[in-house]
Amino acid sequence: MITSIMQPTFLPSPIYLSLIYQADNFVFLDNVQFSKQSWQQRNLIITKNGPLWITLPVLRKKDKIINKIEIDNKNKSIKKIVDSIKFAYSKKKYFSQYFPELEKIILKDNKLLSNLNIKIIKWLCKSFNIRSNFFYAADLVDKIGEKD
């Protein structure tokens, strides 16, 4: 049995999804400290003008763990992120098949960054028929050492 663990990232790479694909169990490492300007809240997209960083706006308080970081839903840059993705990829082959749902997930009033990232990751896994048992590290802390 293979178990993998990673922090929930914003718009994960194919390598991230491959890690889930190869695992029987996947743990979202959601109980570690948030790192500003990390893959947890941003990613690169490729535009006709070159790479572009897209960053989710968050309400950050010092020394917060990932699963406590709130998204700044009043910030208009969330819509700009969706528009940037649309502009960069609208002519790609499978865009119309996947973008509408991604847009809904991102634009929904998501309170916590980790929840948004996990929603995206689980949606991608479902879309690509990637199956694994998902767990949250924060839920496992109290269970360390327990046996079934």
PLM region spans:
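Residues lining hydrophobic/aromatic ligand-binding pockets adjacent to catalytic sites
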Residues: 1-148
